[in-house]
Amino acid sequence: MRDSFINTLLEYGGISSLQARLLKFLTGIQKNLNQDALNLFALLLAKQSDGDTRISIEEAPLRKAISRKMQNLGIADFDQFSESIVNGASSIKQGAYGNIVDSAPDASSFYQKPFILQNGFLYPSKYYFAKVIVEDKVKEFFNHIPSDESEIPQCIRTIESITRGPQGGGITLEKEQALAVIRGRQENLIITGGPGTGKTTVTFFLLRELYLNSEKHLQAPLYLAAPSGKAADRMKESIEQSVNLIGADEFETNLVIYNKMSNADSYTLHRLLGYKPDDNKFIYNSENHFPENSVFVIDESSMIDLTLFANFLQALPHSARIFLLGDAHQLPSVDAGAVLGELLESKADSTVKLTVSRRFNENSAIGHLAKLDFSEAPCTFVPPNEWDMHSEVQLLNLDTREKSAQLQGILEKWAGEYLDSFVELAAQVVPNQPSQEELLERVWNFCTQARILSAERSGPAGVQNINDAIERLLLSKAKGANISKIIMLNRNQSSFKLYNGDTGILFTNGNGEKFILFKTNRGFVFYPEYQFAPNVLETAFAITIHKAQGSEYDHVLMFIPTRPEHPLLNRQILYTGITRAKRSVTIVATPETFKAACETVIERDTGIEL
């Protein structure tokens, strides 16, 4: 039975086929490698999908890790696997596999063994060395320098005097925002806050303050970056919008500064570092740094994984200025490691926390729900047939015995409210015809005002099934006519300056030719569908909550799993979905799974010590 553990992990999606081949490769390097130790290595690889970069080889925490992983995968009978893995840990403690496990790691060594054992924890080598780099570099770059808080009132008055807000007056910063501007003059910062707290706006004025006081940084490059191209472009657009709020006199006085910020390029972190896929290396690295005094603004820092962050930090010159922006409560990175969480926990003195949201009031129904605190007012669920779509917050109790029928009813109601008008209006669009800008804007607004989010990709309430159901609903109403549909890119299309996560609308003209509409900084652009590989486009009436990070919609319908011990039931996934909504959010769950999600926090074991 012991040798079936790896096959079981493969069957349940705990490891990939590539990871299984890696495990087989280990037996060629270490001839005496037994099945028990191989199962331990398999568990370590499987834990990476949970974001962990190490496991303890001490019996009690190891058994706990095994149990948690098996429950997450839905594997009920795993006692025989536990005994095998614990036995494997004992053999590794005794130093039995020196060809593949290094207990005295040296980053400069020509040959790196696949695994490292340190202080009772087993790491894949790449994560161990990334951890060491992050520990060293964070201590180098993030050191608190006390600021004079008495400057806050003057900072607020200055910003008010040089700006012209939408209502005619100047922009008034909150005290916490002004403090960030003052602190950024002399220290690197982690700026965290929820949606609408003004992280990018604060950074804009922070950069102005830095450049007014440091000619050497003004003369050096400014880099705007994020893990995704979509997030990076959105930050650049926000910076450009902030420039437009500057008064004429101030703009002329500090023209060089505002031109610098307006003209700064945006990058994905991979493109910023100069990723070379042929040899899986970066142009900028520990031996080839960015220019001295460069300034970096990195948005969506919660989505940065451990190894990418290590590569970024070791490419920086000592004179660099760094500002990391992110929301600590959002979902962490897809890949292993939770960089922002580690920094906020260990570097509180280098952190500015923005708490005042202008997207929604914290005392509003959505604002209260986002706190996920029901100690004073317990949440109330209603059956789907009592759903009030115009309520700001609704919790629908999905009866698992009638799941299919209730799900169909929910989707029919949603489509009738938000998608029927979209399809009717989109039918008036003629791809590539001039003089229909106003129509395109109206269609686009319908497309982006509401979205279905799901924690899962597959399953009855996963995005694949929901998209299929919505498409069938709309086609049945169209009586055989072609319908337009919302799509999303799942891969960067650099030649078009389109990115993974960008939303578009698929249209069909009178000749049956298909075109995709995207909204770019050049306005609306139609692209023939044939210019995209088929597997690059996904239907996106519904998208995963993870894909929705950084987006906002007026109305959100969110599905979370109905299996009580599902690994995607956690506070971060709830918070991320809820805070995408501006006007209303409906959550479809069971009271039990909603409670489980509220009480579960994603905790990643990386071993980082700062």
Predicted feature descriptions by range:
Residues 329-487, 493-496:
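Conserved helicase motor core of P-loop NTPases
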Residues 178-181, 185-392:
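ASCE P-loop NTPase helicase motor core
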Residues 1-76:
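Intrinsically disordered, low-complexity N-terminal extensions of AAA+/P-loop NTPases
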Residues 72-76, 80, 243-263, 424-442:
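Short mixed-charge
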Residues 75-153:
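Interdomain "pre-motor" coupling segment immediately N-terminal to P-loop NTPase/helicase cores
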Residues 117-194, 204, 210:
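Pre-Walker A segment
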Residues 502-511, 515-610:
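C-terminal accessory regions
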